Amino acid sequence: MDFLYPYPPLISGILVKRYKRFLADVELDNGEIVTAHCPNTGPMTGVCQVGAQVYLSKSDNPQRKLAYTWEMIQIDGTWVGVNTALPNRVIKQALADRIFPNLTNSYDTFKPEVPYGKDKKSRIDFLLTKPEEKSIYVEVKNTTLSQEKLALFPDTETTRGQKHLQELIDILPTARAVMLYFINRGDCTHFSPGDAYDRRYGELFRQAIAAGVEVMPCRFMVNPEGVKFLGMAELVV
């Protein structure tokens, strides 16, 4: 299979427990129990199942306090990405490979983590530019919550996420604004805002669409070998 982002060799285990937001105890296949860094500090609603199979990466950096990082978990037969640093790595490669038809001809270069907003204290995940074209501001959101085949974001109240939506609205119409939802599991075919988890986010989401913010709910298949782009999910508003 041709992966957009191939993983290095990963280590299999079973989730024993997750605690203090940043930590997870995992029993490796050889019976050893190790403590891994959990990059996802959110509630991980529906994707933190004790006893589920997980995969870890291991760093050789002696300066790291924890050598292992929790990368993914298997929920009801589907691998779900846990590492919140993954989406931006994958989208960076996707932009380099120009795999998004609605963006392909609209940029020559792109830069990550560019300051923007009224106070320049926010950072857009990617800024795409091309002479004589509007700049494109792309915000990326890791999405793991699902109800059957419907992916939902957010999975908890997020004032930060609300702020990002408002900032995208504010840059219109002098630039293009894109909210890209990285659906970090391959079993979801549709996407909707998680109104039950953050009603205000849902309201702003619909306001953003009405104002001209472009929504890209991107489907990705994740497994221990790598990450593959599956196309766009259908937006349910």
UniProtKB/Swiss-Prot annotation:
> Which Gene Ontology MF annotations are present?
DNA binding
| Origin superkingdom | Bacteria
Task: Please name the InterPro entries in this protein's record.
Answer: SfsA (IPR005224), SfsA_C (IPR040452), SfsA_N (IPR041465)
PANTHER family of this UniProt entry?
A: SUGAR FERMENTATION STIMULATION PROTEIN A
NCBIfam families found in the cross-reference section? sfsA
Tell me the protein family, please. Answer: Belongs to the SfsA family.
Mind telling me which HAMAP family this protein's record contains?
SfsA
Instruction: Name it.
Output: Sugar fermentation stimulation protein homolog
Recorded source organism is Synechocystis sp. (strain ATCC 27184 / PCC 6803 / Kazusa)
